[in-house]
Amino acid sequence: MPPESSLNAEMSKKISFFGLKGLKLWVWVCLVVGVFIVMILCILSLWITFRRKSRRSSSKFPFNQIPHVSKDIRVDRAGFQNPHPESLYIEMNDKSTGKTMMSHLGRTKSSDNDTLSQCSSVNHHERACSSHSGEEGGFGSAGRQYGGGPVTASPLVGLPEISHLGWGHWFTLRDLELATNRFAPVNVLGEGGYGVVYRGKLVNGTEVAVKKLLNNLGQAEKEFRVEVEAIGHVRHKNLVRLLGYCIEGVHRMLVYEYVNSGNLEQWLHGAMRQHGNLTWEARMKIITGTAQALAYLHEAIEPKVVHRDIKASNILIDDEFNAKLSDFGLAKLLDSGESHITTRVMGTFGYVAPEYANTGLLNEKSDIYSFGVLLLEAITGRDPVDYGRPANEVNLVEWLKMMVGTRRAEEVVDPRLEPRPSKSALKRALLVSLRCVDPEAEKRPRMSQVARMLESDEHPFHKERRNKRSKTAGMEIVETKDESLGPSGSETKP
């Protein structure tokens, strides 16, 4: 009998299994193969489902998904044994205490507390002092701290602990939709190329500002990471506090404390002027607070933070007229061994330091120049660049140098200021501003020195046996020596 006929005969035999009779062998073979295939499909289905769930759960640790975008931002994985092997740590050195802190970007409870600040005034307004969020910050070389007052509760109190991180809070998209009424247009506080800022209220009643970043060619990822790593782990009463963030799908959002009295640009040039004009004391309080914040970023922590976009609209003001430096989307971090970095020129026209604009070399001296322009803006009430004015008055810095050089310094004061500042107060502020905008970067003072100058009730340079006369922008200004400060504001060697 041919083999084919024998095989057909065998496959056609009727066999009984499991009580089933009369089924041919080939039918049983097909049933077994079919059951095997179904089992394989079930196993694959279970495996795929498990993988999807594991991906969802891993997305709750968002920093593992964000690519490193700048070599200037140093994020160190912990080099010691720790209970969170997949967590990230950011190394921070506080120069004022000599301590090294490791900021943990993993799941743990938050214990952030705040302190309060002071009071100031505005024409036609009376405001009482009250407790306000903020924290102390120290100046490394100055050896002192600014801030103080009773400790107040964290704005994150009452939120689900499962979302707490070491320095802030992880918010879901649903959390922020509820807080902002689904990002209603009526809650828009401001917008720009970076995205839109909304006012919101968390479930615990805390008012917040939610920055929703626009994902233009990955810019949202870049700005998100820069801001989180620049200020997510630092606390100072004059820095706007980053409360947390949201990463969900393509959404990148940052959640800040809500600062309720606008910004310096609005008070000097915009809508807040309808509430009255800032007094000289209020302006100097805002400027001094900004100087303290920059001194903390430049001198009290490592790596130091260069803000790169100091301008009036980034100086938020609370209801006690305390400055809150904000918007760190352009910030760069410098290690202690770096004198500068080379980077693409970014910033706001009129505030950018000339050496940075010309060469792309960036360090903290660029921020100091921008601060000097900001101080001039507060003194004069003028924009840094105003093409609506005569040609010789378009550039604020050049116009002021010309006015000082022709001995007309008292004419530069904002005409809306009532009462006007004393001659000594005006002279001190002008001297500080001119030193900050010195075209030679190395001659600009450090921000801790600037803060001390602005806080002093006397001339910033104490008298010695003899005065040294120098010319600043063409006008002779008596500039006395300090035992520790040279004519450029830098430390002198014994």
Curated annotation (Swiss-Prot):
Biased segments, Basic residues type: 462-471
Cited CDD domains: STKc_IRAK (cd14066)
Phosphotyrosine found at: Y256, Y356
Superkingdom of the source species: Eukaryota
Phosphothreonine modifications at: T172, T343, T348
Membrane association type: Single-pass membrane protein
EC number: 2.7.11.1
Region Disordered, annotated ranges: 442-494
Residues that span the membrane, as ranges: 28-48
Subcellular location: Membrane
Gene Ontology cellular-component annotations: cytosol; membrane
The Protein kinase domain, residue ranges: 183-462
One Pfam family cited in the UniProt record for this chain: Pkinase
Catalytic reactions of this protein: L-seryl-[protein] + ATP = O-phospho-L-seryl-[protein] + ADP + H(+); L-threonyl-[protein] + ATP = O-phospho-L-threonyl-[protein] + ADP + H(+)
Alphabetized GO MF terms: ATP binding; protein serine kinase activity; protein serine/threonine kinase activity
Keyword set includes Transport: no
Active-site annotation: D309
Modified residues (Phosphoserine): S313
InterPro entries: Kinase-like_dom_sf (IPR011009), Prot_kinase_dom (IPR000719), Protein_kinase_ATP_BS (IPR017441), RLK_Ser/Thr-Kinase (IPR052232), Ser/Thr_kinase_AS (IPR008271)
Key words of the record: ATP-binding, Kinase, Membrane, Nucleotide-binding, Phosphoprotein, Receptor, Serine/threonine-protein kinase, Transferase, Transmembrane, Transmembrane helix
Chain sites annotated for binding ATP: L189, G190, E191, G192, G193, Y194, G195, V196, V197, K211
Similarity annotation: Belongs to the protein kinase superfamily. Ser/Thr protein kinase family.
Protein name: Probable receptor-like protein kinase At2g42960
Organism: Arabidopsis thaliana
